Amino acid sequence: MEMMVHGRRDEQYGGLGLGLGLGLSLGVAGGAADDEQPPPRRGAAPPPQQQLCGWNGGGLFSSSSSDHRGRSAMMACHDVIEMPFLRGIDVNRAPAAETTTTTARGPSCSEEDEEPGASSPNSTLSSLSGKRGAPSAATAAAAAASDDEDSGGGSRKKLRLSKDQAAVLEDTFKEHNTLNPKQKAALARQLNLKPRQVEVWFQNRRARTKLKQTEVDCELLKRCCETLTDENRRLHRELQELRALKLATAAAAPHHLYGARVPPPTTLTMCPSCERVASAATTTRNNSGAAPARPVPTRPWPPAAAQRSSA
């Protein structure tokens, strides 16, 4: 009876362990009462399982009854009396009963208080990124506003010219590709445009002219490069043919003919200037060989004294 009162008190306080000392005393007293009780009758119902259990502060144990009822009574006490804060933690046992009890009870006040403030790491990161993105968006909006102010409060539109205006601008550009401020203002008044528009048109026209000239120069250089490449290939082929012909002629011609060395014939041609130089040298050698030699006197001159006496 005392054990039942103890169990109800534990259930009333939610297993907070307030009856630890009382459980020790009641456990010992319950064991003594079981020893003094007479054996149960055949027609009587077995005693409830709560009376077979005691509390020793560290876990549940059965009273001094028979051994064949000890283990079953201990398991029954574990199932009936739930004291999660006072019993030991079994790492091999899943907390199914506690989960079921918590689900049946519903969310507690502490959980309801924590739900609005609780958030996952992803939500925390998203909130931080949102806070960081807000200044960047504000900065972009401010930059766009400043651009609008600089551009006069609106986007710059492309200048549309009539045929007459374009013709006048083209003629003026052919005469002068650059304009001074006075010419620019006069042309703007003539065409009913702004000086800035005239200046921009001339800048674009100069850029287009330069680009076209660059393209023309590039095409000309490409053609020159192709021509030089073809000429270089032709010269290489001729050089290889001449070398092969020279080697073949040198191998076929005899080296000595009647004791005199005969130079191998060659088909190499010389430029006109080289031929003129060679012909002039040959003519000089031939003329010097055909001219008669000057006679050398063999009789000595008479002495000067004999000539004076004869005179």
From Swiss-Prot:
Expressed in root provascular and vascular cylinder, provascular and vascular strands of leaves, provascular and vascular strands of the whole panicle, in mature embryo provascular bundles of scutellum and embryonic axis and provascular and vascular strands of young immature spikelet organs. Expressed in differentiating and differentiated xylem and phloem elements, and in outer and inner bundle sheath cells of all vascular bundles. Expressed in auricles, ligules, culm, guard cells brac hairs and pollen. Residues 280-289 have a biased composition (Polar residues). It comes from the Eukaryota. Residues 212-256 are annotated as: Leucine-zipper. Gene3D superfamilies: Homeodomain-like. GO terms for molecular function: DNA-binding transcription factor activity, RNA polymerase II-specific; sequence-specific DNA binding. GO terms for cellular component: nucleus. Keywords: DNA-binding, Homeobox, Nucleus, Repressor, Transcription, Transcription regulation. Residues 29-69, 97-160, 279-311 are annotated as: Disordered. SMART domains: HALZ, HOX. The keyword Lipid metabolism does not apply. Probable transcription repressor involved leaf development. Binds to the DNA sequence 5'-CAAT[GC]ATTG-3'. May act as a regulatory switch to specify provascular cell fate. Homodimer. May form a heterodimer with HOX2, HOX3 or HOX7. Belongs to the HD-ZIP homeobox family. Class II subfamily. This is Homeobox-leucine zipper protein HOX1. It comes from Oryza sativa subsp. indica. The lineage of its organism: Eukaryota, Viridiplantae, Streptophyta, Embryophyta, Tracheophyta.
